[in-house]
């Protein structure tokens, strides 16, 4: 219906489909706020955990809300010489979760998660100088990334909230991005993501490049 420009009918079916998904998944929007509170607690200036730091200057992490333009930027950056992308890797997320999840009995065992990460990506990176890790949700993990790879590059994609929400709502993500089936849940997640990005920038003073999606797609030269 959308391809036929029957917007009213297409909207009707988008809403019906997402209502069914929402009822099945029963996503709890406050669950991410708990995660953010835990991140802030662990990454306050008074409570930085002591990990081995790696001086690899050639790791590039592309983060942002899903559907914010991360894939577009990944393709642009990866087109340069001597760069390879690993795509949406879950390694940083898994290493972070094992150390900061309050319910994880193995939490904080390793003082060198950076070596674990580098060993995991070596089979993809091989002889390439630069390596891209493009998991949008790593915006949660910027503090963890900058702690173990202080010289890494982080690119943050930011898109208009409403356009971002519509794009998410129209995708069939199901369990991968469970909040995408509800505009309310998307709104809560968007606000959460803005909160943690302000924390990284204003409180922790981490340096990252912010790219606005709208300006990027307008610049076609």
Regions from the PLM with identified roles:
Residues 83-86, 90-103, 125-221:
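PAPS-dependent sulfotransferase catalytic domain
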């Amino acid at each position: 219906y959308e391809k036929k420009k029957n917007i009213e009918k297409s909207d009707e079916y988008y809403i019906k489909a997402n209502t069914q998904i929402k009822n099945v998944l029963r996503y709890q929007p406050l669950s991410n706020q708990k995660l953010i509170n835990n991140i802030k607690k662990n990454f306050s200036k008074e409570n930085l955990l002591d990990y081995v730091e790696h001086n690899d200057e050639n790791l590039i992490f592309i983060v942002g809300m899903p559907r914010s333009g991360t894939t577009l930027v990944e393709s642009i950056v990866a087109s340069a010489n001597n760069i390879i992308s690993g795509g949406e890797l879950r390694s940083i997320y898994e290493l972070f979760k094992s150390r900061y999840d309050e319910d994880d009995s193995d939490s904080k065992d390793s003082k060198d998660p950076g070596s674990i990460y580098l060993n995991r990506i070596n089979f993809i990176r091989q002889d390439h100088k630069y390596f891209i890790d493009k998991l949008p949700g790593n915006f949660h993990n910027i503090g963890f990334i900058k702690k173990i790879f202080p010289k890494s590059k982080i690119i943050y994609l930011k898109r208009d909230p409403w356009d971002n929400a519509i794009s998410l709502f129209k995708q069939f993500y199901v369990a991968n991005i469970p909040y995408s089936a509800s505009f309310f849940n998307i709104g809560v997640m968007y606000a959460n993501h803005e909160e943690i990005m302000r924390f990284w920038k204003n409180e922790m003073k981490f340096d990252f490049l912010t790219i606005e999606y709208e300006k990027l797609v307008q610049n076609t030269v």
